[in-house]
Amino acid sequence: MKSDFTKLAVQALARLVKPLAALQMAALLAAAPGAWAQTPAHAAQGGDTILVVGDSLSAEYGLKRGTGWVPLLEKQLASEKKSAKVVNASISGDTTSGGRSRLPALLAQHKPAVVVLELGGNDALRGLPLDMTEQNLSAMTQAAKKAGARVLLVGMQVPPNYGSAYAASFAGLFPKIAKAEKAALVPFFLKGIADAADPVAAFQADRIHPNEQSQARMLANVWPELKKLLK
């Protein structure tokens, strides 16, 4: 359940920005304080391991278990007869700092062949320094590659609540890091959702988290790049 602070923040956001911009903040508010709950790890027998490290956009926040984009990924792998297994280590509320602190143990435990990094939204929600977000994502990418994994960065975009320069620089972090670290990239995780003709229909009642019907589109945004990393 959201805290009173979070509810007030959402209400204030709706008054301060256009409806579409508020929906584009989904990537940020998706990991609101008080929504900490790691999803169970799912792993089929055999094949490479795909480790997903994300926030509530990947942790099925507000969704029935098994309906999020990560469980849909497992079904996609099965339908294409890919033997890869999926470990979802996403936590609602996580930041790049939290992900960076958790990653070494996850790499040691699961020894993934592919690491999907879906973090950064909460950093922008809090207006954290962009250089810190960049350092954390770069360090996570480097650590995963050093452990022998291929990395997929999942990019986000935000409305200019902290100024257009901040929003542009934040969006630019993901391609910048991907290029520097030679990692794969999903340019915008919520493409076709936050920028849809009727974005309200793509979100849960809170108008923050993508609904069950949007999960397939989220997977569709990730799958083309992820598929290239699978052997």
Regions flagged by a language model, labelled:
Residues 1-15:
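N-terminal secretory signal peptides that target proteins for export/translocation
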Residues 2-5, 82, 100-231:
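Alpha-helical cap/lid subdomain in secreted, periplasmic
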Residues 16-34:
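Bacterial N-terminal signal peptides
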Residues 38-92, 102-111:
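Serine-esterase "nucleophile elbow" of acetyl-processing enzymes
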Residues 59, 95-96, 126:
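Alpha-helix N-cap/loop-to-helix initiation residues
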